[in-house]
Amino acid sequence: MAFSDLTSRTVHLYDNWIKDADPRVEDWLLMSSPLPQTILLGFYVYFVTSLGPKLMENRKPFELKKAMITYNFFIVLFSVYMCYEFVMSGWGIGYSFRCDIVDYSRSPTALRMARTCWLYYFSKFIELLDTIFFVLRKKNSQVTFLHVFHHTIMPWTWWFGVKFAAGGLGTFHALLNTAVHVVMYSYYGLSALGPAYQKYLWWKKYLTSLQLVQFVIVAIHISQFFFMEDCKYQFPVFACIIMSYSFMFLLLFLHFWYRAYTKGQRLPKTVKNGTCKNKDN
């Protein structure tokens, strides 16, 4: 009886919570419930931390050079497209970069922003291949807590962003992240091409700095919300989450920077058989 009562209360709470969801995205892939993505991400964590390494234990590493070249440059092009769409659906045509609320209308611009948010969300599932490539190539030392946590938490939390607030000030970090990914995955793609391209990769050391700057800019932007008395942004909880994430990842990447560069405990060279070692964002 107690379990049945708890279940009914849980269902009631879920129904009350989900009624505020954006009806425009209800029928989009993976958007009906958080359960499918939770199962997918749970299996991802299990595969990259346990099942995958066990399956590869007595096997030779896969040679995935062509696959990684194709994948990395695909992400570059996809990121360019998403960045452009974020600009053309709000950030370059009317957003103030301060208190930008979500437009829930079905106007072409509002729907374009919602679709771009979903594309960004879906891109995070594509990027799970980063870790799967590590596992298949037996580069298990690269499957770090920072890497797996980042690749898991981003799509999971972005489901809620798309479901409830596909637009507005909560999407600025996505715009910035797509721009950063253009640079990062360009580097990864060039690295995968082999040693002949090493002379063009002198800017490797600036990648972590770029990531750190990204988190600082996101924190500065979202912090404005807490100092604007009349901002009508519909989901303040997302502003709190974004602020928390920006500081959390800033600290994690600062720790990485300190360990890899300041203390001299640098990770192995970036390119070896066409892979990038420091792929944590």
UniProtKB/Swiss-Prot annotation:
Catalytic reactions of this protein: a very-long-chain acyl-CoA + malonyl-CoA + H(+) = a very-long-chain 3-oxoacyl-CoA + CO2 + CoA; eicosanoyl-CoA + malonyl-CoA + H(+) = 3-oxodocosanoyl-CoA + CO2 + CoA; (5Z,8Z,11Z,14Z)-eicosatetraenoyl-CoA + malonyl-CoA + H(+) = (7Z,10Z,13Z,16Z)-3-oxodocosatetraenoyl-CoA + CO2 + CoA; (6Z,9Z,12Z)-octadecatrienoyl-CoA + malonyl-CoA + H(+) = (8Z,11Z,14Z)-3-oxoeicosatrienoyl-CoA + CO2 + CoA
A single GO BP: very long-chain fatty acid biosynthetic process
Domain of life, per lineage: Eukaryota
Pathway membership, UniProt: Lipid metabolism; fatty acid biosynthesis
Binding locations of 3-oxoeicosanoyl-CoA: 124, 137, 139, 142, 147, 187, 204, 208, 211, 266
Active site: 150
Protein name: Very long chain fatty acid elongase 7
Modified residues (N-acetylalanine): 2
Family: Belongs to the ELO family. ELOVL7 subfamily.
Record remark on domains: The C-terminal di-lysine motif may confer endoplasmic reticulum localization.
Assembly, per entry: Homodimer. Interacts with TECR.
UniProt GO MF annotations: fatty acid elongase activity
Enzyme class label: transferase
Residue ranges that the UniProt entry lists as topological domain Lumenal: 2-27, 94-115, 163-171, 228-236
Tissue specificity as recorded in UniProt: Expressed in most tissues except heart and skeletal muscle.
